[in-house]
Amino acid sequence: MSNRMSQSLNEEDPQIAEAIANEERRQHEGLELIASENFVSEAVLQAAGSVFTNKYAEGYPGKRYYGGCEYADVVENLARDRAKELFGAEHANVQPHSGSSANMEAYGAILQPGDTILGLNLAHGGHLTHGHPLNFSGKTYKIVPYGVTKETETIDYDELEKLALEHHPKVIVGGGSAYPRIFDFKRMREIADKAGALFMVDMAHFAGLVAGGAHPSPVPHAHVVTTTTHKTLRGPRAGMILSKQEFAAAIDKVTFPGMQGGPLVHIIAAKAVCFKEAMEPSFKDYANQVVANAKVLAQSLADQGFRIISGGTDTHLMLIDVFAAGMLGSEAEKALGEAGITVNKNAIPFDTNPPMKPSGVRIGTPALTTRGMKEPEMRQVGIWIAESLRHRTDPDFLGRVRRQVHELCDAYPLYPERRATRLATV
């Protein structure tokens, strides 16, 4: 073996090593409140960085196009079986590389180009892959969006039913990326049946809450369910499709060879690990704490005078109308970043501002909950957010908040053994 094959990352590529070290430091020292982000376990990290990254395994367990796949088969079978057990699904395909890939492949299995999709408007909390005109979904299929009411900022199911009966979509899609309330899966399935449509749910954001029993499951109601495996599920950045058995063959065929070649076996291994972790009793505690933390944080911000979209949250995320407080979402994101608090700017329902300068910010609690923070910390975080936004043009004030944030993060260390090893080698 050449010397290069045994060199450490520091030796081979100090620039990348430094970037990784800096990112590790950033994650440790700041409050991660982006709703789609989380911290995986050391076990998930190890699986994702394993020698399975070397292995090609086109096909499915027992039906590969390459030799030497016996252990890849073990990994994928474990991932599939655990996913089915965890979510009570009849079929699981764990090969999608991302949530967007999973949606593309699910559509490919149940739709033809030009078919109609009824999906939640992106501006009302949906996702790009649910029909945005710049996305493949909007370019490939006819899109009819449904939305929320101005009064409650929650889904208007009467309008949804009216649209379904008028347009007769091939599929109705539930789920989104910035909707803080629980979808009424039972009613959506009833509407789909009445309109002669299939019902698909994208549970990427709340899959971990479903796994932990803190959120209703769409699996009994939907024909097809897609998800990411990160976010609240706390696994690697990837995707998955669950379905009724009648759609299994079509989904598998579209995924491979239809849209993907070799699966990422190292990531599938990490998925299997995260599914096992999600079956443990402690994960139920985690999922329920995520929701409890979100409710307390939303209330803390409301107490500080900020308007919470729909009046609160039932999930891990909330949308804050910062435009009503005199600023753009982009300004709020920047100010909070300087205070050591990471959020993302986000459009709110009926937003009249452009996407890069929207009226809101999206906030979520999965990552802070993973660190062990609970209700008292959420109240304090809400105060820091509010004060930082009020003093957003005062760098000295934001610096003081950042130091307080750093102290709190030190009390809830992230990957302590990893940090100790790194510090010992400096």
UniProtKB/Swiss-Prot annotation:
(6S)-5,6,7,8-tetrahydrofolate binds at L122, G126, H127, L128. It is found in: Cytoplasm. One of its GO terms (molecular function) is glycine hydroxymethyltransferase activity. One of its GO terms (cellular component) is cytosol. The record marks H230 as: Plays an important role in substrate specificity. Its cofactor is pyridoxal 5'-phosphate. It comes from the Bacteria. PANTHER family: SERINE HYDROXYMETHYLTRANSFERASE, SERINE HYDROXYMETHYLTRANSFERASE 1. This is Serine hydroxymethyltransferase. It comes from Koribacter versatilis (strain Ellin345). The lineage of its organism: Bacteria, Pseudomonadati, Acidobacteriota, Terriglobia, Terriglobales. The gene is glyA.
